[in-house]
C-alpha cells in the first residue's frame, strides 16, 4: 500500500512539474525581456555540477586539460537526452559552471580559448536551449586565478582586469547570436577557494569596503566586455555575484550593484549561494565546537545525541531553524528584488549522509534532508529568488546528487522530492511577483 501511495504521489508531483513548464514562444527567442520578465521562466533551476568546471590549478593559462576534464570529477559525458530529461523532471533552467583558463587557453596574451573546448561548451548550451531551458554559463573558480588571486593585497589589478576583459570578450563573441535564454554570470564565488600557484599577497577581508569596491570594478569590466561585442549581447541579462556569494556580505551597503553602469536597461541580476547551516549541509566530522547535524527540526529521534538543528545561533541569538531560512532569503528580497534586481541562488544543497556512521537513524535523516530541501526551495521562491539546486552525479553517500546521469533517472528521491515539494509550495507566490510577461 505504501509503495502504491508513493507511486501516486510521484505521479502527481510529475504532473505538477510538467504543468509549470511554459511552452516556448517567439518572445523568448528574442531579446526584448527585462531581467525581471525573464525571471518568470527560470525557476526552478539545476546545476550541471562537477562537470565543465572541473580543473587543476596547475593547468592555469595552458591547454593541458582538454575535453577529458569533463569527466575528471564525475564519470559521465553530458548527453542531450540527459539535459532533455531535466526539463521533463520539472526544471526550467540549467546552470553550467565552467572553467576556461585552467587548462583551456591556447594563447595567454590574447586569452584565446581552445576551439574544441568552446565547441563543447556551445554544444551543451545548445542541448539546454533545445530542451526549452534557460541556460547560465559563468567563469567558475577556474583554478583561483580570479576568485582568489585578483582579490589579494598584492594583486596586479590592472593586469587582472585586462586579462579578464579579453577572456569575456572571447566568450561573448562566440555567443553573440544566442537569444535571451542564455545568461552570463561574471564569476562564481569571489573570495572563496585556494590560491593559484601564481598568487601574490594575502586575501583582502571579504567583508571590507576595499573587497567590495574591487569586486564591483571587475564586474564592470565583465559588463563592458560583454556589451562591447554587440549583437544580442547588447541586451543580454548578466548576473553579478556578491562577495563570496554570501547573503550577509551581499546585504552589506558596501556592495551596491546599482553602482554598475550599463548601456542596457534592467538587464542585471544578482547572485548568492546557500549552504546553511554548515553543521547540517557540509560538515562531515565532529569538532570540539559542535557535531555533525543529521536531523532537521521536527524529524529527530527521541535520543538524537545532539545532532538536531532546532535553532541556529545568529548574531548572538538563537533563531528557530525554519525562521532562520526565511530571514536570510528575505534579506535578498529587500536588498535586490524589491529594487528591480532578480536574485539567482546559483547553488544550494546539503549532503545526504550515511547516518549509521554517526550512530544515527537513516530514515529520520532522509526525512530531514527532504524537509530541508523543501523548506529552503519554498522560502527562496516565496522571496522571489531563483533557486539552482547543486547536483554532482556522485551516487555513494555522502552526496548532493539528484540524478543518475548515465541512466537519466532520479537517483535520490529524498532530495528530488524535497526540491519539487518546495517548488509546488513557492511557485504561486513567485509568479505573482514575476507574472508571465
Q: Model segments located where?
A:
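Active-site region of glycoside hydrolase catalytic domains
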Residues: 158-321, 330-351, 382-385
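Acidic/histidine-rich helix-loop elements
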Residues: 49-78, 107-113, 156, 279-322, ...
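Active-site mouth of glycoside hydrolases
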Residues: 25-33, 39-237, 242, 248-250, ...
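Bacterial Sec-dependent N-terminal signal peptides
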Residues: 1-20
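Aromatic-rich peripheral "rim/lid" segments of glycoside hydrolase catalytic domains that contact
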Residues: 355-437
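Amphipathic coiled-coil/heptad-repeat helices and related helical stalk/stem segments
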Residues: 79, 328-329, 372-373
Amino acid at each position: 500500500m505504501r509503495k502504491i501511495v508513493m507511486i501516486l504521489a510521484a505521479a502527481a508531483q510529475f504532473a505538477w512539474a510538467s504543468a509549470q513548464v511554459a511552452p516556448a514562444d517567439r518572445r523568448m527567442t528574442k531579446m526584448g525581456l527585462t531581467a525581471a520578465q525573464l525571471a518568470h521562466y527560470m525557476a526552478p533551476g539545476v546545476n550541471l555540477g562537477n562537470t565543465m568546471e572541473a580543473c587543476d590549478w596547475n593547468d592555469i593559462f595552458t591547454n593541458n586539460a582538454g575535453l577529458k576534464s569533463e569527466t575528471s570529477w564525475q564519470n559521465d559525458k553530458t548527453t542531450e537526452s540527459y539535459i532533455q530529461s531535466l526539463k521533463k523532471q520539472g526544471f526550467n533552467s540549467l546552470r553550467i559552471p565552467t572553467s576556461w583558463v585552467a587548462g583551456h587557453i591556447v594563447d595567454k596574451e590574447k586569452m584565446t580559448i581552445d576551439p574544441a573546448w568552446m565547441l563543447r561548451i556551445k554544444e551543451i548550451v545548445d542541448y539546454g536551449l533545445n530542451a526549452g531551458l534557460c541556460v547560465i554559463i559563468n567563469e567558475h573558480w577556474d583554478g583561483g586565478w580570479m576568485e582568489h588571486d585578483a582579490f589579494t593585497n598584492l594583486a596586479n589589478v590592472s593586469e587582472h582586469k585586462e586579462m579578464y576583459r579579453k577572456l569575456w570578450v572571447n566568450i561573448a563573441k562566440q555567443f553573440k547570436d544566442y537569444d535571451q535564454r542564455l545568461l552570463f554570470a561574471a564569476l562564481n564565488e569571489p573570495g572563496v577557494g585556494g590560491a593559484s600557484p601564481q598568487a601574490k599577497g594575502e586575501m583582502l577581508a571579504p567583508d571590507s569596503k576595499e573587497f567590495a569596491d574591487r569586486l564591483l570594478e571587475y564586474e564592470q569590466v565583465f559588463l563592458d566586455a560583454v556589451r562591447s561585442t554587440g549583437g544580442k549581447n547588447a541586451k543580454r541579462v548578466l548576473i553579478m555575484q556578491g562577495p563570496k556569494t554570501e547573503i550577509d556580505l551581499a546585504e552589506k551597503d558596501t556592495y551596491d550593484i546599482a553602482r554598475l553602469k550599463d548601456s542596457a536597461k534592467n538587464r542585471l541580476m544578482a547572485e548568492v549561494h546557500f549552504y546553511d547551516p554548515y553543521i547540517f549541509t557540509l560538515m562531515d566530522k565532529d569538532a570540539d565546537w559542535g557535531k555533525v547535524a543529521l536531523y532537521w527540526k521536527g524529524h529527530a529521534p527521541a535520543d538524537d545525541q545532539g545532532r538536531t538543528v532546532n535553532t541556529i545561533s545568529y548574531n548572538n541569538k538563537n533563531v528557530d531553524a525554519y525562521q532562520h531560512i526565511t530571514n536570510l532569503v528575505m534579506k535578498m528580497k529587500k536588498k535586490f528584488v524589491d529594487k528591480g534586481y532578480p536574485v539567482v541562488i546559483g547553488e544550494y544543497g546539503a549532503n545526504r549522509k550515511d547516518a549509521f556512521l554517526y550512530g544515527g537513524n537513516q530514515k529520520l535523516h532522509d526525512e530531514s534532508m527532504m524537509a530541508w530541501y523543501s523548506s529552503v526551495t519554498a522560502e527562496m521562491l516565496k522571496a522571489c529568488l531563483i533557486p539552482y539546486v547543486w547536483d554532482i552525479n556522485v551516487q555513494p553517500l555522502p552526496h548532493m546528487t539528484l540524478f543518475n546521469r548515465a541512466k537519466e533517472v532520479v537517483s535520490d528521491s529524498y532530495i528530488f522530492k524535497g526540491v519539487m515539494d518546495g517548488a509546488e509550495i513557492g511557485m504561486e507566490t513567485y509568479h505573482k511577483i514575476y507574472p508571465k510577461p
